[in-house]
Every structure is written in C-alpha cells, then in structure tokens.
Amino acid sequence: MTDIVTEETTVETPQGRLFAKRWRAAPAPAPAPAPGPGPGPGPGPGPARHAAAPIVLLHDSLGCVDLWRDFPAQLARVTQRDVIAYDRLGFGRSDRHPGKLDSAFVRDEADRAFAAVLERLGVDAFVAVGHSVGGGMAVGCAAAYPARCRALVTVAAQAFVEDRTLAGIRDAGRQFDEPGQLDRLARYHGDKAEWVLRAWVDTWLSPAFRDWTLDDDLQRVQCATLAIHGEDDEYGSDVHPKRIAARVAGPSSFLLLARCGHMPHRERTDDVLAAVATFLRDAPA
C-alpha cells in the first residue's frame, strides 16, 4: 500500500504567483523486522527505489488544481510516481491574469509558467499529461523539452479548431449566461471566474484563433505518446487523438473510450488510470 503525501507551494513568476501541489508516491514504511535470536544487527535497508520521472498535469480551460479532485492521488498511487499540478495564471488559487490570452497562449505555456514550475520544484525529467487545452499545452511542453519529457499523455485534447469544438463552446457559453451558472466557476476561481469564462469562450471563438493547430509542435515530440479520447466528446471528434498519434515523431497510440464525453478521467476513471499506468510501464519513461 502506498501513502500519498501532499505538498502545496507557490511559484513566483514575472507575471504573478502560481499555486502548485505535489502528490508524493512515497512507499509506506515497511514493518520493523522482529528481533532475531542472535546479538547481531537486523537486515539493513534494501536498495533505494529509483525515482521515476514525475507526472505534471495541465488543466483544461475552466479547470484548476482543485478540479482534478482525487485523480492526482489515484494517478500517483497506480503509477508509483509523484504527480504535480498547478493553476495557470488567472485560475484557481493563482494570481489574476493581467490581460487577455493571445492566440499563442497554448504554445507559450511551455516557456513561461510550466518552466517556472519545473524550476521551483526541482524537476528535470517529467511526464506531461494534459486535459483538453491542457493536452495541447502538454504537447507544447514535450516539443519544447525533448530531452526531458519522458512520455506524453493527452486526454480529450484538441489538435485544431474543429466545428464541433466551436459549437460546444458556443453552447456552453449560453449555459453560463443563465442565472447562477457563473457561481459554479466562482467556487473554484473566486472573483476571477468571469475572466476564466471569457478567456475560454472569447479566445476560442476569435477569428484570430481559427487557424490554430498543434501541427508544428507535434512533429517535434520525440517521446512515446498516448492520446485518450471519449467517443462522445462534445468538443472534438476522434480525428483529434488520431491526428495527435499520427503526427508525433515518437512511438504513439490512441485510445477511444465508448460512452464517454469530454471528461474521461471522471467518466471512465478506472480505464484512464489503467491505460496510463500500462503506458508508462511499457514506455521508456
């Protein structure tokens, strides 16, 4: 059995402070050996466990550390790796974002907040795991740090701006116009909730973002890649995981989950955990 130890910290960046949390997959202490009949000392400690590269989670457009809920702890337990998650600037418990997102915000994450988190937490090699737009950011991180990224997992990620993506965002935007709906976001983002919503809806529906794709970054991903996607994802068809798997330079596969929408890690938690654990066990990660 593994005890999961959590640590919370802040990460200073030129734009503001970020909130980060780490789930350490520390092995539970072994019971002390029973004293033997002889006077000699008991057996010494066994060989130290090799520290596998930690998993860094990148959240979706409305997400934050707290909205991962118990998934990071479960992931740490099944993979026997540390898991790190952080709130991007403007989200959750991080500082306010000073302005609007520009059309390069997905790719820029690797060079800005992500890099600061790695430095602050002393992380060298890592596994990038991202949900939705966080999956696109995970691709960018794998592309930016090919010598350090040991493996990449995308969950319900978009590889380009599909009509289904825009339709889903428009529909969600209308739902948030209903009285009380913004309060759902405020529970996690506080008085930043309106900015979080507008950063998602307005950025993705902007004409300046219409031609965005992951193509340039995908071809620079050298590590093993797993693209997980729900067959009923309201924000993207199965073209996305297939495109991700087909265009990365390293070994790749995709997993389509039946009867699953845009939240595979919530809707099909056990399947996602098993897939990631198997993938990381088999990959040179």
Regions of interest found by a model, annotated:
Residues 221, 227-229:
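Short beta-strand/loop motif that positions the catalytic acidic residue
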Residues 19, 23-29, 47-96:
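Conserved HGGG/HGGXW glycine-rich cap/lid loop of the alpha/beta-hydrolase fold
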Residues 85-126:
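Active-site loop/oxyanion-hole signature of alpha/beta-hydrolase fold enzymes
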Residues 223, 237-246:
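Short alpha-helix in the alpha/beta-hydrolase fold that links the catalytic acid
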Residues 232-236:
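Acidic catalytic loop of the alpha/beta-hydrolase fold
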Residues 136-144, 149-181:
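Flexible "cap/lid" loop of the alpha/beta hydrolase fold
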Residues 246-262:
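Catalytic histidine neighborhood in serine/cysteine hydrolases
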Residues 260-273:
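Catalytic histidine-centered segment of alpha/beta-hydrolase-like enzymes
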